[in-house]
Every structure is written in C-alpha cells, then in structure tokens.
Amino acid sequence: MFEFQELTKPALFTLFGRDVTAYALFLTLGVLIGVLMSINRAKRTHYDVNAALLFPVLAIPLSVIFGRLVYCLCSIVLLLDNGFGFIFRIDYGGFSIMGVTIGLALAALLTAKIEKVSFLDTLDCAVPGLLMALALSRFGEGATMNGTGFEVTVPGLQFAPIARVGLYGESTYAVHMGEALVALIAAV
C-alpha cells in the first residue's frame, strides 16, 4: 500500500465513496457540453457523426493518461515523495495541459485513421467543444486555490473577476478567469 500526501479540497458531496468537488462538476459539465457541441457541429458540417462520437471515447482516457503522466514527470519530487502509485491517484488532481493536448491530438489522429476521415476535419469538429470544456474547467478553478497570479497591490483592482482572495488572504490576480473568458469566446 502506498502512502500519499494528503491534499485538501472542499467536497460538495460524496458519490460512490468519492468526494466530488466544484471543480470536478465544472469540468464534467464542460466535457458533456463539449461533446454535445461536437455532435451538433458534425451534423451541421456533414462530418461523420460516428467519428464525432468516437473522438471523445478516445480523447477522454488518452487526455487523462497523458495529462497525468506529463504532470508527474514535471513534478518528479511529488512522485518520489509519494511513491509510484501517485501516478494513478488522479483524484488528487494535477494534470498538465501539455499532456492533455498530446492525448487529444493522438485521439484525433486515431479517430481519423479508424473512421477514415480527415485529421483536420476531426479537429475542426472537436475544437469548439474542447474550448468549451476548457472554459468551464477554468471557471471551476475558481473553487480551488489554483489559477492565480501575482498579488494585486492596487486597491481599485481588488475585486472579482479581476482578483480573488489567495491562499493566505492576500488579493491575487484571477488568471483562471482570463483563461476561461478567452476559451469561452473562442468556443462560440
């Protein structure tokens, strides 16, 4: 049995013995809306709907695997402190957007090969939904202590959505809000 460093996250409720956080809800909602957007886009652009359905089936596990793997490689100290089993503790958080992107690109490549459709058409169909999922996950980051920037020292800028209360009570830039708004605008 591996020993894991305990990380605190506010749970909204428990489902099947697992804590469910606000971030997890936002991310799940984003993925569901993203999949629906991709299916709708496939129908409107005459892209193969089966390919649009295959993409998330491949993309979700591949993005989780590669996102976690790259995070653990970049956070080797956490891996060494907590043991090899830490890689499999995705409920502790920690994913690399670079790794997730690798997983998504691989899923698009596999979808194109399996369904015999264009790789670029696959991306064209999937990207708006992926951006929506990114936007909602970044909005959800507001429920965590992540996604913040430097301390805001100008009192006139110490309000939401520009700033948020940091880990130690200081006012910090809410970087996650900017990321979320850019992704949301790009998605629509």
Predicted regions and their residues:
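A feature for loop-to-transmembrane-helix boundaries and adjacent hydrophobic helices
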Residues: 1-188
